[in-house]
Amino acid sequence: MSGTQNNDMKRQFLLERLLDAVKQCQIRFGGRKEIASDSDSRVTCLCAQFEAVLQHGLKRSRGLALTAAAIKQAAGFASKTETEPVFWFYVKEVLSKHELQRFHALRHIASDVGRGRAWLRCALNENSLERYLHMLLADRGRLSTFYEDWAFVMDEERSSMLPTMAAGLNSILFAINIDNKDLNGQSKFAPTVSDLLKESTQNVTSLLKESTQGVSSLFREITASSAVSILSRAEQETDPLPVVSKHVSADAKCKRERKKKKKVTNIISFDDEEDEQSSGDVFKKIPGAGESSEENSDRSSINIMSAFESPFGPNSNGSQGSNSWKIDSLSLNGEFGYQKLDVKSIDDEDADENEDDVCGSMPGRKRPGHSESPEKPLDAGTCLSQMHGWAPLQVLHGHAEVLFPVSGVGSYGPADAPLGSLENGTGPEDHILPEPGPRYSVEASPPGQESPLSSLLPSASVPESMTVSDLRQAIVAMMNRKDELEEENRSLRNLLDGEMEHSAALRQEVDTLKRKVAEQEERHVTKVQALARENEVLKVQLKKYVGAVQMLKREGQTAEVVPNLWNIDGEVTVPEQKPGEVAEELTSSYERKLIEVAEMHGELIEFNERLHRALVAKEALVSQMRQELIDLRGPVPGDLSQTSEDQSLSDFEISNRALINVWIPSVFLRGKAANAFHVYQVYIRIKDDEWNVYRRYAEFRTLHHKLQNKYPQVRAFNFPPKKAIGNKDAKFVEERRKQLQTYLRSVMNKVIQAVPEFTASPQKETLTQLMPFFVDITPPGDALTKNSRPKVASRFPKLARGHPRETRNVEPQSGDL
């Protein structure tokens, strides 16, 4: 796949990730119902995606700028992140002076990376990201100055979507902390030696494993990379090169393929006299060399060039293919020089234990002589995990940094010593092939002796212990690996949160659909049952129709056959039968009869519906008129619920009942302020006799207690209770008047049912004998004034005694309704 296609796929991948992050934030925080803070993984993912888009394709600094940055980093004055280009360099071009001062004044932000991240989060908080993106993308000439042609922001089609996505985030209320030291990325200052030693002693095993994994991933990168040769001499091409063959077992190959490439820390190592004394002579000068190792060390700070070749394939003798590295030395002033190299070895205890199980013990090698070929490969049992013990070599190559483990060729060492670790001193574990010529060999460490943990720490008594430089490199590699794992963990967690939300939405949608389906099924079942009942009714009706048609058929045949049997002379004649005509006539007659019956049935159904509607309307009218009659004339004698079910008996009972009406039309307030009380006017009419009585509430209560003793059914009547406070309120008095009127009407109906003598001859005297409550005697002290009578008479003109009375007909008049 070409580089253009790779860049296009990368841009599309960044766009999809950014769209997904924006969508997740809109789903979670849309509508400003909840504040979006940086504690939420969705907001963190959104910021990370915007940073990746703006960081993509930034031009890197070249030449002396890169060299100066690398020297600052190696000296511990700057972190690696400051040598990388950041989008803050371009963003600050469009910011005003006050905005720049604002971001430079942040207390906890001390790097350009942190200022860029703080600007992005501030733009999200203030809903100004859309405006900034329009400003950033407006000037294409300025963009080309800071970004490569294949950068995301240089793609007009995709970059035009950035302001649109930023506008979609305006509905979210962000509250992100911009003055946070975590935005700086890595620490600005290099860690001290005491801090490094303290951290290393806490978890040495984990530290060594992480660092060795980083080195092994570096070897895979170097193996996969193409060969590079810079300033190589023609004489060096003819020199024999040492080839190290590494045989990887099937399990180790699978493990290598599964591992993801890791980012390797790039640090330039500058040697001094103390390092020379502690590490010893690693590379020996061959006879004829005109320069010392110290002179070469001084020159190595000026230019250090290496040529790597990665040949693959089987050997000429048919053995298994091996990955080999060939390193040509640099010739200075016509003479071969030697670099001053830092080569350390770290043995991983866990890796050694696993190698004992997988690879087994490794046999020793014979000591090669001058007649043996220097390209003799290692034994085939060497596993990939054995290379985890190699320490990285820092080499500055152009504007890229590479780590590479080597050991000097030409050093001494016994052949029978195990390939344990590559040491800088004169220890017996160094396995070096002496061979004249400026070249280096790369060898792997077998699972040999396990070094104790104490040997990994700096100690004056143990010359093979780790130095501060080794520990610093291992810890930095471990920290980089830790950052990578944390970033990967955050991205996976963001994806997991998104999938969980998606699955929850799907589950909710499924539940909703299930409820809808259940409701539809219930409606369908009800409809099917109704249709089944209707079908049964139609079947019964069809049977009736068929029976009626058959009956008509039999009657028609009898009527047609009998007259034709006799002619005029009285002789019996047999008519000629035509089967075809008879069948047609029968069929047509059946059809006519069936149509007539169907029409009759339809008319009956329509007539029935019309009668039902008319009956309902009449019932409503009767109920309304009855209520109006009760309001105008008082209660109708008797209760319909107490009448007989037989309609004839019910009519007889109603016609023979006594017509007694009771009202409480008004209430009067008597007495003075302290002793005021209400008097209720009770109007009674029995046929043509009418009179009024005036009673207080206490008298109604006494009547109720007496009737309870005489008629137990009276207990079920609704009698208004006594009220001590607020009993003179107008609304309360009106409500009590209605309740007392209903109560008296119920009592009169009960008396009519219980006393047949009164029902036979309803008169005033009989009623007053049964119930002295209705005696027309004004209580002492409650005599009404003359002014009160005319008022009552004016409200009820027909109820006044002095009013001339007309003769009432027995039949009810229209005015009575």
UniProtKB/Swiss-Prot annotation:
Residues 445-460 have a biased composition (Low complexity). Residues 347-358 have a biased composition (Acidic residues). Residues 271-299, 344-381, 417-460, 784-817 are annotated as: Disordered. Residues 37-181 form the RUN domain. Keywords: Coiled coil, Phosphoprotein. The modification Phosphoserine is found at residues 269, 292-293, 331, 345, 451, 641, 644, 648. InterPro entries: PX_dom, PX_dom_sf, Run_dom, Run_dom_sf, RUN_SNX29, SNX29_PX. Pfam families: PX, RUN. It comes from the Eukaryota. The keyword Coiled coil applies. GO terms for molecular function: phosphatidylinositol binding. Residues 466-546 form a coiled coil. Residues 658-781 form the PX domain. The modification Phosphothreonine is found at residue 643. Residues 369-378 have a biased composition (Basic and acidic residues). Belongs to the sorting nexin family. This is Sorting nexin-29. It comes from Bos taurus. The lineage of its organism: Eukaryota, Metazoa, Chordata, Craniata, Vertebrata. The gene is SNX29.
